[in-house]
Amino acid sequence: MANLHQQQIIDKIQNITFKDGTFLNEVISDIIIKGNNIGFSIDISGKNKLEAEEIRLKAINKLNNIKEVNKITIVFTQSKTIDKKAQKPKHFVENVKKIILVASGKGGVGKSTISALIAQQLSLENYRVGIVDADIYGPSIPHIFGINGIPKTVEGRIVPILAQNIQIISIGFFVKAHSAIIYRGPMASKIIYQLLSNTRWNNLDYLIIDMPPGTGDIHLSIIENYHLDGVIVVTTQQKISEIDVIRSIDLYRKLGLPILGIIENMIYMLESDHCGYLSKKYHIPLIAQIPIMPQIANACDKSLPLTNLLTLPLEKYL
């Protein structure tokens, strides 16, 4: 008879999730294997106990399909909760109702284009919308909207530039074109604070934040310091893109930020096994699949509205 090993257990329960999107594999520990008997603990901190019991039974049913297993023991544990009084209070952005991040672990997947499209579409639907270009090292929003000016200041606060009826702020407004932007992490985080909190937003329904690639200081600074309503994840069909996006998904789940959906950008015309893969694997809604369209790049280069080319089913997800 073959020996049991931990990977068998993990593989069997990998698709079991809580209603909040947490995968069971993320909250189990202390896996013990003794002969044909197995056991582990589930951290149910912040979970509904009835739901946790349902999850436990699902896990037992899955594990009973391993022929070598004789006895299964699953216990519940709870990690120490953080004293809310000791938690750092999060900031609300003045005159902003909702803040949505547009993110991806990979650069070059079209986050800025998607951010612009979302903002333009919401504006056409009569919402008051703003964009923060949080890609400090590679700001693209000024180019997409054809903005060359420098924002004014009123009473020490930045007035966002209005383009296509959208209020926009970007570090790109304050540096020379094609100049390298060189900031260490703490300085980049301070700039983000200035762009978010020191801008005179005019009664926004939605503030879209075009995030930089990766999962670094800027991401942590925004997520840990501001009240956010969710994140839209952008990816492509390429495997290398998916690998980085998975890291982003892991970050947002660990930090408790709702993932509103996935947008697959620059989809090939041919069928691919990767279409919808992340949405299915991580149980995240697939908002849209956008094909490769030269017209989109042309519209961005000419600062034309992207809504002339396509729209997204945003009402279902925002």
Curated annotation (Swiss-Prot):
The keyword Nucleotide-binding applies. PROSITE patterns: MRP. Pfam families: ParA. It comes from Rickettsia prowazekii (strain Madrid E). InterPro entries: Mrp-like_CS (IPR000808), Mrp/NBP35_ATP-bd (IPR019591), NUBPL-like (IPR044304), P-loop_NTPase (IPR027417), YlxH/NBP35 (IPR033756). ATP binds at residues 105-112. Keywords: ATP-binding, Hydrolase, Iron, Iron-sulfur, Metal-binding, Nucleotide-binding. One of its GO terms (molecular function) is ATP-dependent FeS chaperone activity. This is Iron-sulfur cluster carrier protein. The keyword Transmembrane does not apply. PANTHER family: IRON-SULFUR PROTEIN NUBPL. Binds and transfers iron-sulfur (Fe-S) clusters to target apoproteins. Can hydrolyze ATP. GO terms for biological process: iron-sulfur cluster assembly. Belongs to the Mrp/NBP35 ATP-binding proteins family. Homodimer.
